[in-house]
Amino acid sequence: MSGVNEIRSMFLDYFRKNGHEIVSSSPLVPRNDPTLMFTNAGMVQFKNVFTGLEQRPYSTAATAQKCVRAGGKHNDLDNVGYTARHHTFFEMLGNFSFGDYFKERAIELAWNLITKEYGLDAKRLLVTVYHTDDEAFGLWKKIAGLSDDRIIRIATSDNFWAMGDTGPCGPCSEIFYDHGDHIWGGPPGSAEEDGDRFIEIWNLVFMQYEQITKEERVDLPRPSIDTGMGLERVAAVLQGQHDNYDIDLFRALIAASEEATGVKAEGDRRASHRVIADHLRSSAFLIADGVLPSNEGRGYVLRRIMRRAMRHAQLLGARDPLMWKLLPALVGQMGRAYPELVRAEALISETLKLEETRFRKTLERGLNLLAEASADLSEGDQFNGETAFKLYDTYGFPLDLTQDALRAKGIGVDTDAFTAAMQRQKAEARANWAGSGEAATETIWFELRDKHGATDFLGYDTESAEGVILAIVKDGAVVESAAKGENVQLVLNQTPFYGESGGQVGDTGVITTETGKLTVTDTQKRGEGLFVHYCTVEEGSVKTGEAAALTVDHARRARLRANHSATHLLHEALREVLGTHVAQKGSLVAPERLRFDVSHPKPMTAEELKIVEEMANEIIVQNTPVVTRLMSVDDAIAEGAMALFGEKYGDEVRVVSMGQGLRGSKAGKPYSVELCGGTHVSATGDIGLVRVVSESAVGAGVRRVEALTGEAARAYLGEQDERVKTLAAALKVQPADVLGRVEALLDERRKLERELTEAKKKLALAGDGQNGSGDAARDIGGVRFLGRVVSGVEPKDLKSLADDGKKSLGSGVVAFVGVSGDGKASAVVAVTDDLTSKVSAVDLVRVASAALGGKGGGGRPDMAQAGGPDGGRAAEAIEAVAGALAG
């Protein structure tokens, strides 16, 4: 029996021997394809090769591609754990031909692998072909020797693949494995085809046509091959299993969750272990590829997956975060094939632990509310969709968790009502937004773009230029001219002014004509390539068609260039120090400062920030040229350029490289390489200096770094130096000795605070004359009772005071009430261990709380705490406890 890792290796080795380039799995976040949330098939990374937009140095390839299907139309989330073959994460084995071999060789390679290399019984295999594909039908007979009844013609779209409404397409041929007549189900195309007897293990797509229009289809000049075989499915067949969750990989993960929870994967607990095993895989791989839990987009899908697993961990009785404890088992199983798991293990572990800790309160609250709302429902009933939406909207409880929690009771959810409630909320939000004219104005820019074309940007090479005024916009309408004092927007045929984008704010400066002068206060990009200059007419007037001289504020642009280049250096330094999971989540490049948001699950240490800053300044000191090049996005990514994956890039992109790497894989190579349309310094030395001034959280899994460069950084350091000198003078020490003096003062303060606390405790235990129950312990029904109203003791110190009281009694009950400055009271009751079977501290403290005007109280039988608003009744509270003790 072959293990999953061996099956994967055999597949890749087989195709390597047969002349295929073995290509590594692409990330789960598709590169340069905003139409996909996640990579969901092996052909995704070759999409542009198939369409002819990209050339590769090989014509045949094979991959083991990691895939996720948990969003959009490919959403298996609800079924995962409850069926034999649904997964959120899976591996797709595939071989590809880009105009090289076609049907005959593809069928031959597939048949030889599964029958000769994997050793599957040919008698258990049958295939399907598209109903008009006589060529494939004949080839299966010729190569595999299959009889006509084991080559099934299918007329549906199941056996015809298309990339979209237009583009490459072609017939498919699927290979099925027969698990035997002891399992219900019929062959594909039969009335019983939805049964589990015949399972598809491999799909061969023959791309031989191009769809031109809905009615027109032509032959491709170079037909291609795209195949996909689910690793988990073929492993189940090879290991003699009918259920994917019974293969060796899943057995190892489930064994880890059994050990961690102490609950066997049996009966109604079986599905929970399966959910956890599957969701651990998708969560870990998504985090390794730079996705972090959030409330939108890919991050929200990840959060839903993680929270569903965490809910099933709770069903298994886990009271502490569980998934991070299972991570070593996953890394042990898959880390060799996917080294990114090993590289990101610390990040994955930290993210899993943090998310589960945060979610526990939401889960508990949501489950309680769900239980209340569904108490009167029976099997077959529908849970109210509006209530489900309230759980989601108000309490952060996702719909799929509601569905999953109710599934065990046989209760469905009215998803139509849920969707209607969500749409209604969105409509109300739109109606409540009064707006300020921006939406109406936006249409003008598209109209001007269509009329005049895109603005030519000259600002990479110059900060001054000549142009022609094409349009003047005032108050949302196009006008012919503008006079002194008017605020307008100008569109010109070309400009050196940078329009705000990529985090860099727009340029300011001056525009002059023969008849007037304008101050440019901002520049924005509008209407797909239109640069809009926001201006005030300072002198004379201006009109459409006039020639104009445009001059950018040079000093301000210089600061912007330095700050933008510094963000690139900081980005790379952060990735070096924290890990390759760090990705840009937002930025602000302003003239006076820079701000950079990155994906990272926890606060950075002072040491990490120090190293990041030192690395960036190291590159600045090199004073090497900053190089910009234009190239295709695929060439840029092949060179290691960082991009905002998922963004749509044009055929040509601008790549900015700076610095010389000094260590590791960067040694001898450019330090930072990014796709960027912003303006940058000519050499790294022009940045002058970078100083990180703060690091903070802006959301779950996102940290913000703020920094200064050049003169602003030097001014900041000067101010800090002055503060240290002022502090040193106040402390009467040299600046170098400030830290030591402050530490000594803090130690002295802590010592005095401890002494003060101990003195207060002794005073309280000795009696301070403020209680109405006497200073000494009393005997109540054979139990020694010490009750006091204490002053000057913080509520947080009452418990330790009560512990001291118990020790002084040896055996008995202690009750203390402290009153704060605002008149509120805190009460604590402690019972020695020998009496807890007779007397409960929880019961007694509730009596005290009631006397103080409070409600409840809680704790353990030996120690409980409560409070109340009426500190004036503190002595009564002590006597109330004494009375309750007397019975």
Curated annotation (Swiss-Prot):
GO terms for biological process: alanyl-tRNA aminoacylation; negative regulation of DNA-templated transcription. Its EC number is 6.1.1.7. It is found in: Cytoplasm. It catalyses: tRNA(Ala) + L-alanine + ATP = L-alanyl-tRNA(Ala) + AMP + diphosphate. It is an enzyme of class 6 (ligase). Keywords: Aminoacyl-tRNA synthetase, ATP-binding, Cytoplasm, Ligase, Metal-binding, Nucleotide-binding, Protein biosynthesis, RNA-binding, tRNA-binding, Zinc. One of its GO terms (molecular function) is zinc ion binding. Its cofactor is Zn(2+). Its main location: cytoplasm. Binds 1 zinc ion per subunit. Signal peptide: none annotated. Zn(2+) binds at residues 564, 568, 676, 680. One of its GO terms (cellular component) is cytosol. Pfam families: DHHA1, tRNA-synt_2c, tRNA_SAD. PANTHER family: ALANINE--TRNA LIGASE, CYTOPLASMIC, ALANYL-TRNA SYNTHETASE. Consists of three domains; the N-terminal catalytic domain, the editing domain and the C-terminal C-Ala domain. The editing domain removes incorrectly charged amino acids, while the C-Ala domain, along with tRNA(Ala), serves as a bridge to cooperatively bring together the editing and aminoacylation centers thus stimulating deacylation of misacylated tRNAs. Catalyzes the attachment of alanine to tRNA(Ala) in a two-step reaction: alanine is first activated by ATP to form Ala-AMP and then transferred to the acceptor end of tRNA(Ala). Also edits incorrectly charged Ser-tRNA(Ala) and Gly-tRNA(Ala) via its editing domain. Belongs to the class-II aminoacyl-tRNA synthetase family. This is Alanine--tRNA ligase. The gene is alaS.
